[in-house]
Amino acid sequence: MSDLKKIYQDEIAPKLKEELGLGNIMEVPKITKITLNMGVGEASADRKAMEGALSDMTAISGQKPLVTNARKSVAGFKIREGWPIGCKVTMRNQRMYEFLERLVSVAIPRIRDFRGLNPKSFDGRGNFSMGLREQIVFPEIDFDKVDKLRGMDITITTTAKTDDEARALLRAFNFPLKG
């Protein structure tokens, strides 16, 4: 069992149950999955760009990413239906907690000019989304072997019913939220 999962079960969940005034420990919000998404727009012109994105995503997440294809052709972006334009990874259970620990303790502190995560990044249903401008904040990525700096979207899906519950959950996991 991951250290973070054990901390959640032993410390965070009872504290949140008390703080949120919930009757049952099963009502306490928890993180169900973390999704990483990387759009690779230049993959339409350069096939090697997708390979670099896939290797970076594999190193960061520890599992093979799913290649996402264009749903329809868009002449303005010079893409055709079915062409690869990005990749995504959905992490659950053990890998999710390991990634969360690396994100909070290593990656977020390495972001340049970081002043805290935007508290408006919640979607109204207890899920949190954030974007990274460069993948080199993760220690698994070797800066010398990176062909291009790519950003990615990170979505944390929780069982929280409101943004306030999700905010309390992420603060308990030491997320540096502003305000």
From Swiss-Prot:
Gene3D superfamilies in UniProt: 3.30.1440.10
GO biological process, any: translation
One GO CC term on file: ribosome
Domain of life of the source: Bacteria
Keyword presence, Ribonucleoprotein: yes
A Gene Ontology molecular function term of the record: rRNA binding
Keywords: Ribonucleoprotein, Ribosomal protein, RNA-binding, rRNA-binding, tRNA-binding
Sections of the chain in a coiled coil: none
Protein's job: This is one of the proteins that bind and probably mediate the attachment of the 5S RNA into the large ribosomal subunit, where it forms part of the central protuberance. In the 70S ribosome it contacts protein S13 of the 30S subunit (bridge B1b), connecting the 2 subunits; this bridge is implicated in subunit movement. Contacts the P site tRNA; the 5S rRNA and some of its associated proteins might help stabilize positioning of ribosome-bound tRNAs.
Oligomer status and interactors: Part of the 50S ribosomal subunit; part of the 5S rRNA/L5/L18/L25 subcomplex. Contacts the 5S rRNA and the P site tRNA. Forms a bridge to the 30S subunit in the 70S ribosome.
Similarity comment text for this entry: Belongs to the universal ribosomal protein uL5 family.
Protein name: Large ribosomal subunit protein uL5
